[in-house]
Amino acid sequence: MAVPSVIVAESSAPQASAPRHPIRLGGPIFGGSSDPEELARQHRAEGYRAAYCPGVKLDDRERLRAIREGFAKNDVVIAEVGVWCNLLDARPDVRAQNLQRVIDGLAIAEEVNARCCVNIAGSFNPDVWFGPHPKNLSEEFFDAVVENARKIIDAVKPKRAKLCYEMMGWALPDSADSYLRMIKAVDRDAFGVHLDPCNLINCPERFYNNTALLNECFDKLGPWIVSCHAKDLKWEVEMNIHFVEVPLGQGALDYRTYLTRLATLPGDVPLMMEHMRSAEEYRNSQKYLRQVAQEVGVSFD
């Protein structure tokens, strides 16, 4: 059985006339140096001008300074501090510990001039910390994650870094509209958007019409987007729906639209490749992105 081709829709946004700026591309460094300045140079050698934050503790002031200065010296922006834990863990002690971990993560992001600290909003699943649960789409979930976002931001009071919740296919925010509603409910300038369109593709309609999905995200969330993920999605045909992540260019995501819209955002928003298995897959994915970028008149340099 063959999967029909993806529909590429026209955007209502004036993409052709909008000014475009170079996109900062980033990804992980395999076997990277522990020295921040050397690690930043390794990023540049790979063609990257954005990076994931190196490991660092909040109380290690010297390393925080070295990361901030070493990456800035080499014009490499730290896109995100990822703190991956369940802010809605059923165990009160673990939930409190996880909340503090994200507070520390946002404080680290502020110290190293990262664009954001990112985590999923959480899950009520008792067995898998990021897993599906019926209540992950409920008002109870929405209210709890809004309260957590306020607590985290109010504890740090960042002036530059944003707190973001990663989009998910089975937990809020699971759409542009639910993210926009969350932004309004949190009501803090330091709450931003981390765009991961592949995570939103959870049904055939979104898979086939991912161009429209991308345009909706940029149209509705553009002013708040501070960092983005790059991966691709393929439909493996089975007796039920099964989408799998694949290297860029091997799936269905409309990167012509993604790159065009990203290059016209008002901010300098990094695009971070993720979830690939080897340095070779990242290099091939970067090659694909640069080819598409050239076709649509977008630069990474």
Predicted regions and their residues:
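Acidic/histidine-rich catalytic cores of soluble enzymes
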Residues: 81, 147-247, 252, 261, ...
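Acidic (Asp/Glu)-rich catalytic clusters
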Residues: 16-20, 38-45, 60-80, 104-113, ...
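Acidic-and-aromatic substrate-binding clefts and catalytic sites of carbohydrate-active enzymes
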Residues: 29-37, 53-65, 86-90, 125, ...
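N-terminal export signals
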Residues: 1-13
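Active-site acidic/histidine proton-transfer and metal-coordination neighborhood
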Residues: 14-17, 73, 92-193
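C-terminal helical cap(s) of enzyme catalytic domains, especially alpha/beta-barrels
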Residues: 282-300
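Hydrophobic faces of well-ordered beta-strands that scaffold small-molecule active sites
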Residues: 23-28, 51-53, 78-83, 117-119, ...
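Conserved, mostly hydrophobic/aromatic
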Residues: 43, 51, 71, 81, ...
